[in-house]
Amino acid sequence: MRPVFHRPVCRFAMSNHSIKTPCVGLCSTVYGDLVCRGCKRYHHEVIHWNGYDEAQKRAVWVRLEQLLVQVMVAKLEVFDPLKLRQQLEQRKIRFVERQSEYCWAYQLIARGARVINNLEAYGLVLLPEFRDWDLPQLRDAIDREFFILTEAHYQRYIAPSFVRELTEQRII
């Protein structure tokens, strides 16, 4: 019998330790990706993360939050952030407290898409154009769109500065 997500204890519960890195343990930068398909950080951020000061880490967290929120608000509404937070805590799903409730919603869907039957019980409602979607399908679409948006951001704002730096190094 499959575990039912609305029970107080679920099999996919995680520890209550705070999240110190965006890493989700699926780093694709080791295979040459410029943007990690797991955590959506840029390759140089993955490599240098442990050397970053708090301001640098915060800048990465903020960018990831802004891009993810942009994707999430186009798919669902968080109508009760308190209920969502309570459900995350009750189910021991880790989330970054200072982030938007839309990032919290992503954590819920990422961890529970296959077992959630009623999103409203978590303080969420899908926008009309997504109400017929299965949650695993929606989760995959969100992840794909988040990756594409992050990759586009990299190409627009980060890659040109790398090219400029390389060009300047050759001139000197």
Regions found by a protein language model. Give the residues of each.
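Extended hydrophobic/Leu-rich segments
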Residues: M1-V4, C10, F95-V96, L119, ...
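N-terminal cysteine/histidine-rich coordination modules
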Residues: R2-E77
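Sequence-level detector for tyrosine residue identity
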Residues: Y31, Y42, Y52, Y102, ...
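Polar/charged alpha-helical tracts
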Residues: A55, Q66, L82-Q86, Q90, ...
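Short flanking/linker segments adjacent to small metal-binding domains or redox-active Cys/His motifs
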Residues: M72-F130
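C-terminal, charged low-complexity interaction regions
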Residues: V115-I172
